[in-house]
Every structure is written in C-alpha cells, then in structure tokens.
C-alpha cells in the first residue's frame, strides 16, 4: 500500500488538479503535476484505441483497451496515468486503477501524449520506468512536432521515431500498423462521431487505416 501521508497528498493533489486540467502522478515517491492531455490528444488516443480494439477483435486476442485517465500503480512509490493502455483481461482492474502486483498484471502497451515542460520526464525517465516494470511497448505522441516515438522492450530495447506520414509498426502486436495522418479527421467532431467516421472510412478504404499482415 501507499504510505498514508503520500496517498493523502496524492488524492488531495488529484482533487485540486482536476478543476485546473492538471494531471498528477507519483514518481519515486514524489507527486508530479503536468498539463492534462488536450482535446486533440484525447481524440487521437481515442482513434488509436478504436483501431486497436478492431485489431484485437479480428485476431481474437483477450486483451482490453483502457482509455485514460487511469491510474497505473506500479508500486507504492510510482503511480502513472497513461492516456491509453492495453491490458490482459486477467489483470486486476477496478475503480479506475490498474493494480500491478506481478508481471502478468502490467499493461502490455501504453500510449501517451507528450506534456509541455515534461519532455525529459516523458521521453527518458518514464520510458525507462515502463521498460523495467514489464511494459512491452510505449508510444509517445508529440503533437507539436508531429512525431511519434516508440519504445519496444521485447527482445532487447528498440527506439524509433516516426512522422505522422509514416506507417508505425507495433512490435508488441505483430501485424498491427497504422499511419497517423490517415486516421486523423481535421474537421474535428465528438468522440462518437470520430469512431463512426473511422469505421466508415475503414470499410470504404480498408487499406488506409489499419493493416493486418
């Protein structure tokens, strides 16, 4: 369990930060605050999650896509809030919390949007922590520069950078690849509209969104 004082501090920060669009995480026993993922980031993560759900359904995989904010409790000193996580259904998930108490209960795949002012933390510190905890793959989206940084921890460490125009191939889920520019909808819309738009687009142009090989 979390140290009582640290847990109370964390919950207090979360309550106060929610009204200010600030997210809270615990890193090495310290509360870290950052600007919450904005609307564009939420929409992109939602679309990626929708594509992943389709991939998992087609491949009949039992994994489950969770949309953030969701607490990922690595241990008593580290709690993260990924924007998107894929976990196995056997994992302990309740009350908006992924409780990691063993290797089989660690998210296999995590997606986050880069936070302003937290570049080193997101790109280095968190990437290392995820790898050590047993996460198989971590995608970090940079909306400003339009790049995606991928970190794979299967069979050694693999780091790559992709533009939004390039196909990104997952190493955690063989056969899954996507191109961000092909799934974005520049005119905006609600999350439900985006999901309907994506599924319609996939039926009309099945090669443009998700590819299974």
Q: What positions do the PLM features span?
A:
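Gly/Pro/Ser/Thr-rich low-complexity, intrinsically disordered segments predominantly at protein N-termini
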Residues: 1-213
């Amino acid at each position: 369990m979390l140290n009582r004082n640290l847990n109370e501090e964390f919950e207090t920060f979360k309550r106060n930060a929610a009204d200010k669009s600030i997210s809270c995480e615990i890193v090495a026993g310290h509360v870290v605050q950052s600007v919450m993922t904005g609307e564009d980031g939420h929409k992109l993560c939602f679309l990626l999650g929708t594509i992943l759900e389709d991939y998992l359904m087609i491949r009949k995989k039992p994994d489950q896509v969770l949309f953030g904010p969701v607490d990922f409790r690595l241990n008593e000193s580290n709690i993260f809030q990924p924007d998107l996580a894929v976990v196995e259904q056997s994992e302990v998930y309740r009350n908006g919390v992924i409780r990691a108490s063993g290797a089989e209960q660690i998210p296999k795949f995590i997606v986050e949007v880069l936070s302003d002012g937290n570049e080193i933390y997101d790109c280095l510190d968190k990437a290392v922590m995820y790898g050590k905890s047993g996460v198989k793959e971590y995608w970090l989206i940079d909306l400003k520069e339009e790049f995606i940084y991928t970190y794979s921890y299967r069979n050694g460490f693999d780091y790559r950078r992709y533009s939004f125009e390039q196909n990104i191939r997952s190493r955690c889920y063989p056969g899954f690849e996507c191109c961000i520019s092909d799934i974005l909808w520049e005119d905006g819309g609600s999350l439900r509209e985006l999901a309907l738009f994506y599924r319609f687009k996939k039926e009309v142009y099945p090669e443009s969104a998700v590819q299974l090989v």
